[in-house]
Amino acid sequence: MTAAALQIAITTGEPAGVGPELTVQALQDAARRWPDAQFTVLGDAALLDARAAAVGADRAVLAGGPVSVQHHPLAAPAHAGTLDAANGRYVLALLDAAIDGALAGRYDAIVTAPLQKSTINDAGVPFTGHTEYLAERTHTPRVVMMLAGTGERPLRVALATTHLPLKDVSAALTIDGLVDTLAIIDRDLRRDFGLAAPRILVTGLNPHAGENGYLGREEIDVIAPALARASERGIDARGPYPADTLFQPRYLAGADCVLAMFHDQGLPVLKYATFGEGINVTLGLPIIRTSVDHGTALDLAGTGRADPGSMVAALDTAVTMARHRRAS
């Protein structure tokens, strides 16, 4: 008996940005790349058609085969590169439809194109970001943002804190919180990435990982105790290591993931190494969610100059994760 196709939902994000065109471009070879998957594109059908034409992509990919379009009408006409708060709720409606479908079991994974946070806020809806919204909608108390490269041994970087001002990071780090974060990373790398024994390297917070307390005590008072407790739970998490030396091949060779303490500690290295083909994964959710690792790129929208590599990688990772989860 042939297994049922994996069902992947794609939200096309901010209509003035590159999301609609990158979605169509990334799906050009979908039947060959992902023969066991079906893709549902959530967005305005006319917008997708127009943006595909603008960048020279084959619009026929949206008309059958492994790809279908779930039409959601724009609230106002969309023009490449020009934001309109009238479409803020449209963007959120796409995300809600994908989340609802995944929670109901209709989708095995969702892939999100970039959105503009300001547009949603300007529409009167308080919105911090995809990650926080997904956690709220799925009633998940703790999620973990992880960005990753591609290839046989990809660099993966997870974050202990996400969109926080730097002055608030230290207070946000707790022993229990770090243990929970490490447990989520360990579980999801096993279940959704097929890793039998994940190894996680953990950065310190302070320069030189605190220099034995002379440059800060978070490593001694919070991070090291969290690592000890995680070890008692069978989690292979090592550190804390100075972040300025950890990201070297000789350290990363045996690592499956790096846990950084804050956003701009871990992500610049990863984006430098992978930009254009990196992806974002939200760990800890009851559903699978991946996305591109870049923003709306308003200046590139409709020009054909935006690179679909990250969207292809996000789709590929979503399919891979869905295969593992279905088999688990």
UniProtKB/Swiss-Prot annotation:
- What does the UniProt function comment say about this protein? Catalyzes the NAD(P)-dependent oxidation of 4-(phosphooxy)-L-threonine (HTP) into 2-amino-3-oxo-4-(phosphooxy)butyric acid which spontaneously decarboxylates to form 3-amino-2-oxopropyl phosphate (AHAP).
Q: What keywords are annotated for this sequence in UniProt?
A: Cobalt, Cytoplasm, Magnesium, Metal-binding, NAD, NADP, Oxidoreductase, Pyridoxine biosynthesis, Zinc
What does the record's miscellaneous section state?
Answer: The active site is located at the dimer interface.
Q: What is the gene called?
A: pdxA
Q: To which species is this protein native?
A: Burkholderia vietnamiensis (strain G4 / LMG 22486) (Burkholderia cepacia (strain R1808))
The record's top EC class is oxidoreductase
Instruction: Give the reaction(s) catalysed.
Output: 4-(phosphooxy)-L-threonine + NAD(+) = 3-amino-2-oxopropyl phosphate + CO2 + NADH
Which pathway does the record list?
Answer: Cofactor biosynthesis; pyridoxine 5'-phosphate biosynthesis; pyridoxine 5'-phosphate from D-erythrose 4-phosphate: step 4/5
Q: Name one Pfam family in it.
A: PdxA
Give the lineage: Bacteria, Pseudomonadati, Pseudomonadota, Betaproteobacteria, Burkholderiales
Q: What is this protein called?
A: 4-hydroxythreonine-4-phosphate dehydrogenase
